[in-house]
Swiss-Prot record:
It holds the Pfam family Lyase_1. It catalyses: 2-(N(omega)-L-arginino)succinate = fumarate + L-arginine. GO terms for cellular component: cytosol. Keywords: Amino-acid biosynthesis, Arginine biosynthesis, Cytoplasm, Lyase. This is Argininosuccinate lyase. It is an enzyme of class 4 (lyase). One of its GO terms (biological process) is arginine biosynthetic process via ornithine. The keyword Lyase applies. The gene is argH. Belongs to the lyase 1 family. Argininosuccinate lyase subfamily. It comes from the Bacteria. Its main location: cytoplasm. The keyword Lyase applies. Its EC number is 4.3.2.1.
Amino acid sequence: MKNPLWGGRFTTSSSDIMKKINESISFDKTLYEEDIAGSIAHCKMLVNQRIISKYEGQLIIHGLEVIQNQISSGTFEFSTDLEDIHMNIEHNLKKMVGNIAGKLHTARSRNDQVATDFKLWIRKSIVKIEHYLHELQDTIINLAESHYNTIMPGFTHLQIAQPVTLGHHLMAYFEMFKRDFSRWQDLYKRMNQCPLGSAALAGTSFPIDRHFVAQELGFYSPTENSIDAVSDRDYAIEFLSNASICIMHLSRLAEEIILWCSYNFKFITLSDNITTGSSIMPQKKNPDAAELIRGKTGRIFASLNQILVVMKGLPLAYSKDMQEDKEALFDATNNLMLCIEAMNNMLSNIIINKNNMLKAAEHDYSTATDLADWLVKNLNLSFREAHETTGQIVKLAEHNQCKLHELTLEQIKTIIPSINDTVFSVLSVENSVASRTSYGGTAPTNVIEAIKKGKAYLSNIKFSQTDKNNI
């Protein structure tokens, strides 16, 4: 049987292998709500413009609503012979209303149809991701507030560097996710133009009203160029770029969770409901959720790379290669939302082992920078001189197998005779942390202010939206 929608100039039907490689219904049926919403808006416009009759429009819209209910309830039968979601819906619409169904495709192509569907789906997904991120940020800021003065080691090169507060460390991730949130908002604004009415690539000679359709579907405006509208997927690439940055931030936090719950750190304890055991080692409690977030990061990165490679060599306008844009994006979206939710679950039930964090912060001469700063402020040394002198004092402590504050004044004077006993005030991790009051620093007073600002931000946040986000 020849294809009922495009088989007019063909004398034979597609081979089985052609049908197999050509079909996309196995994955683009995900777009059924968006496809039907776009078709209803297009149908209303055709009626308004008197391209089809009001009666025909009513029949078509009723049929589309019936099909939507069938798909939602699981009673609709998809066919790979009909290639994609568009043709499956139109074929079944024809069964209901007859040849009138064919009038729905007046002044449109599957090229602008799928671009519209895809934008609607991405737009809806952006709003979902924003809500997931908002919940995660709320969990992070509440945890930071509970530990605004909990001292832990700060690291560079995964070596203990300087003492910081856990609250400050957590607020670093809050800021990362805040920027992620703004990227989703920016994308929503940039992509929210409607391709429908661009037809195959050149527009149409029918007297359509693209502004009506755009408004009906909640877009800010129609796209400005019909070729651009059907031939680019930069919004999908940007979506996956945002997803990649966001999952990268999640992966870094997941990596720290994995480290922190290990025997070597013992900074945290994860809840039983977000960990797993071993089939052979009864004592194991594995941070599998964190590891899977870290692992799924590569999967999302690959999705971005996939669509970049698909698009990089395509001449204008549409090519069938672009059918390969959806599976990767659907997969990345589902996994990103799952990972955000899993991270939120982990942090909501985490136990912080404060004493272990404090003890670790006191190791590896973490207040050496404070000592160097004291030498600059009190003995008028240049920072380079103070750095050299402090290094010698650290070496002395290593030789004596003690911490900096355990050295005697007499021992330190063998390095720098002009030093006095007030230096010991800066060698405790508590004083070190309290002194870091520069804007954005780790002092508990700063963390409290950062949390206040963060809470105000969360309470005033505006999610990307139109009055059609349910489409």
